[in-house]
Amino acid sequence: MGIDSTLSVLDISGSGLSAERIRMNVIANNIANANATETPEGGPYRREQVEFSSVLNRTMQKSNVKGTERLGGVKVQRILKSTEPFNRVYIPGHPKADAKGFVEMPNVSVMMEMVDLVTATRSYEANLAVINSSKEMNNRALSIIGK
């Protein structure tokens, strides 16, 4: 494995770590606001989701003056607010209840957020394992060269 490919592996996996960290923060924010009936914007909290996009690296090759594109990792494209309707829950006496006793609650399912959190955690761990494997291979290669 050459130095360029080693750095590429670290860059790609590092971008995955950063993206999954942001995703986990967004999920934690969703869980923390699962019962927030009032936000500064007005109305209940809206669930947020992370949208990823792939990053392309442009590389120049001697035989190809125009260069080539190859995958170079992932980045957070944007954080989207859900357009799903709010949950209406019957809670008479709640300060935000309408005349019939219903309160608009955030469109957050804590169970789904926990599933997403496990998925994000596993992706984070996979990227970390790739980085650790790459470092281990490089250390072994250096020890072979040093003998």
List each language-model region with its residue ranges.
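Amphipathic alpha-helical polymerization modules
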Residues: 1-147
